[in-house]
Design a protein with these regions (language model features):
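Acidic/histidine-rich catalytic neighborhood
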Residues: 59, 68, 83
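Active-site/ligand-binding neighborhood in enzyme catalytic cores
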Residues: 1-46, 56
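C-terminal segments that line or cap access tunnels to active or ligand-binding sites in enzymes
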Residues: 72-73, 79-213
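Conserved aromatic-histidine-acidic binding/catalytic patches
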Residues: 17-21, 25, 67, 100, ...
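Charged, often glycine-rich, active-site loop that binds/positions anionic groups
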Residues: 55-65, 211-214
Length: 214
């Protein structure tokens, strides 16, 4: 809701395209919402069935070793649409067909923790979104770009790749079966083309295998 409905930053000293954001991104929003809803959040839980009644909706949730049923007048589904047919048996046919119509490519993402900003071999200096020409990846973002300090001693690059060049099922298999070290080497080799000292500056490299995109 923030991203699509109230992200524009309007102020006397702000540019027309300014956005309202926080140094730690959506984490700031999530913490604020959690504080307002203290005592009403059920974490570490899994929704496994939704049933719609005449005047209410029942949600069965696996919490620890037991199932809890939550009933409400209305339900907002804030998850991937393709999951709904699996947990909502009575989902209307048209809605179910629409949810199952899409195909979702898996994504590989990585966070590279750097002790300093890397050297630029050529091209523009790092910006928020950086795309390498001719690369299999989607580029990387400088995850510290929202920090307001003038000079940072280190930074984090978040790198993305969608495995769209093969069928989604094959992509997910590759994602799981390819060793972490192989993915890490490929990422470093790609970034090394424009940042020759990236290996020396990388203090940590976290790999994330995602069965589907955001």
């Amino acid at each position: 809701l923030h991203y699509f409905a109230c992200r524009n930053g309007e102020a006397a000293n702000a540019a027309a395209d300014a956005v309202l954001t926080a140094p730690d991104g959506n984490a700031w929003l999530a913490r604020g919402l959690a504080e307002k809803a203290a005592g009403r959040i059920l974490g570490d839980a899994l929704v496994w069935r939704i049933e719609e009644g005449k005047s209410s909706v029942a949600v069965d949730v696996l919490s620890g070793a037991k199932t809890v049923r939550i009933e409400a007048r209305q339900l907002i589904w804030a998850g991937p649409a393709f999951l709904l047919p699996r947990i909502w048996p009575a989902m209307p046919g048209g809605l179910k067909s629409a949810a199952q119509a899409g195909d979702y490519s898996p994504w590989l993402t990585a966070n590279l923790h750097l002790s300093d900003f890397p050297e630029e071999r050529h091209g523009a200096p790092p910006s928020w979104d950086n795309v390498l020409y001719g690369s299999q990846g989607l580029g990387y973002v400088v995850a510290t770009h929202q920090l307001i300090r003038r000079r940072l001693s280190g930074t984090v690059f978040t790198w993305y790749r969608a495995l769209h060049d093969v069928a989604p099922a094959e992509g997910r298999r590759l994602l799981l079966e390819t060793p972490r070290e192989t993915w890490a080497e490929g990422i470093l080799a790609e970034l090394e083309r424009v940042h020759p000292d990236i290996r020396r500056l990388t203090t940590r490299l976290d790999i994330f295998r995602n069965g589907h995109a955001m």
